[in-house]
Amino acid sequence: MGVLSKFVIAVAATTAVFAPFAYATRPMENLGRGVVAVRSNETAVLVGWRLLGLDDEDIGFNVYRATGSGDPKLLNSKVLTGGTNFQDLSPDLGESNTYHVRPVLNGKEEAESGTFTLTADHDEEPLVRIPIKAGGAIKFLWVGDLDGDGEYDYVIDRQTAPSTIEAYRSDGTFLWEVNMGPNSENQNNIEPGSSALNVGNWDGMTVFDFDSDGKAELAVRIANGVVFGDGKTFDDGDSDDDQYVAFINGETGALRATAKIENDYLSDGPLAARFGVGYLDGKTPHLVAFLKNRQPGQGAFNLIMAAWTFDGKAVDLAWRWLRGDQAASDGHNTRIIDLNGDGKDEVCEIGFALNGDGSLRYSLSDQGVGHGDRFHIAKMDPSADGLQGYGIQQDNPDLLMEYYYDADTGKLIWKHYGDEVGDVARGMAGDIDPTTPGMEVWSFSGVYNAGSNKLTEEDTTLAPWPQLGLWWNGDALLELYNDGKIEHWDWENPSVSGKLPRYFKIGDYGGSVGTRNPLFIGDILGDWREEFVVTNADFDELLIFSTNFPSDIRLYTLAHNPAYRNAMTLKGYMQSHHVDYFLGDGMETPPKPDISYVGA
């Protein structure tokens, strides 16, 4: 089992009232409490809920349960002021049990925000099942509050030809489908069709409330032949290689607005895309696109970075950046995060970073960094200023394998070299060892403490597989997701990656490993810990895994952390999300996020 937390984190917060749509800070989702309940063992139920980013530091909670058709009864003997979860030790599991929580502030109980019902004779499993329509394989899921009720709804892709997109309310109610048309049928993972989605490292879509009206939109790259949720077909392009960014109504699937993607390399074909979201001016959500195509004969890649805003009526191009012959290496995932603490997000690739205005902030090429598959930016060293980055390399001619750097300036702090050219392929960052301060980083050459550049285990064969991490078991250390297995690193008894202590496999509950990654990882229900979503083998059910471990740690929902919420919009080669403060063993109380709630 993991280490039990030895501390309780209190979140400093204040309440405030903001004028609708006039935001001095970044507007973020006006979330509800996200109440969830799962069986924690044979006789008990774990109930979890959100602490919100702007909750008062003195807020407490009461938990209520209604059994069957009975009236709600208070479960806790005193107001709960620790972790935002509660273990119900005496439910009648033969009946349905409906839970809700009520905030308590200054001795006054406030209104409830949503309920969750655990059905009678529910299986003992750490997950919520959401039935969906039968259909083709699913690669990714995005979340956003499509209907404005304060809870996350779901948007999925279908790996069919043509590709399709489906939207569901949080309870599984089907909303709409978008058919990506004949130009999505070319699903080559390097040079896909002009409206193809989610092949290779390309996604070409994301979900967010771009106009800050309280309801999320789908942003997607489209071309001729796309059929929207209201049945209308898009045909504005002069040719099938003409592409557009489209903002689609999250409730209806109808088109709201488009902007043509300027393709300076149209003679080389349509542009493949990765999408994400950042507040590049500090207060306005921007759609950020990483766009590439390839010159003939397996030639060089053309790269365009671009950003747009959507105000509810029109789409405006904020900027474009063309790499051209500049030395600036890219990879297979993007990070959008405020590097210098000025409130404005930067756009980061594995080998360079752009400022929020689209200008080049720095390139790592002059320090020997080239293409690689994965990189991370986080508060890895709590004793150092700012944020740090860690990346790995693919076939670096100078034999560079992995590196660690100052994410604000791009200055490399340490490098590790190999004996021959090789593709490192995987790299992870997270706090998995409480005996050293800060995060660990690792690929396939051992686990290193990031800040000190020292091995935590001299035998470098004893290391976890560097795939994905998630907070799960109740302490502040990171657990591990690898190929459908939830595991943790036992720093006292290190082992090879195939023999780590394991909590469960998703197959134990009918989950399909699929592409070996989940459809989504992120904090979308309950307290601050993360959920992950997979599907069953028939692709007609979403399995949303949510922790069944109690925790004393009190943190505001990770979805109200600016860096983390940006990360939830990104796919590419799926990577773990990070907050902009140090989250790990021995952490300090994180600062209150500088946000406002839309519509508050």
PLM feature segments, named:
Residues 37-38:
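Intrinsically disordered, low-complexity regulatory segments in eukaryotic proteins
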